[in-house]
C-alpha cells in the first residue's frame, strides 16, 4: 500500500493536462470531459442517499472545487463542504448540523401529523 499522496491528471480545454492531488475521500471524476475548464474540476465523495419507498428524495456528499474562480462556500469552494441536493447548496459543518436539526424537527412534525391523521381516520374527531 502506497503512502504517497494520490494524484490524478485530467485534460482541460484551457490548461491542457492538469495534475492535482486526489483526496482519499474522492470517488473519481466520471463526468469530467476533455473540453471542461480547469475551474470546473471538482472532487466528490460517496453519496449518502435518502430513499423512501424506493423513491430517491435527495442525496449528499463531500465536495471540493480546487480551482474554482468564484469561491462561494455554498456553491463552489476550495474548502471541502457537503453538497446537499435537495437545497442545492454546499454546507460547512455548522450549517450541516443546523440542517440535520431542522430535519429532525420536521420529522417530529410529520409524526405529529401522522398521529392527527390516525385519530381522524380512527373516528377520534
Question: Which sequence ranges carry the predicted segments?
Answer:
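Positively charged, low-complexity terminal tracts
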Residues: 1-125
